């Protein structure tokens, strides 16, 4: 017999792809609102093991790169997109993901996160600088 938590999980929005985030607070925030799996990069010095984990996830279910709307987040996104082609990318505006002192997806509300996940883009064979140009437009 299902418990109350099981019923709640069925009502939560299920994300098929595995979401790549920077850290555990991002994971906690996403799992608060969505039924999803994440891979945490642990910061901007992404090691080969994490890249391989992302490659494996991309081949199984696909991945969505969802990093913070700041310089380190953009650097992480760039590294992942260079090493793992055809990733989907979710973006939030930094004004919708901040506190007084910090910027990060862990500070965004459910609607902001959901809108970002519904409007993912895939960057393919992008010339250098095009991701930065795109980020300046959003």
Task: Describe the role of every protein-language-model region.
Residues 2-18:
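A short, flexible N-terminal coil/short beta segment enriched in small residues
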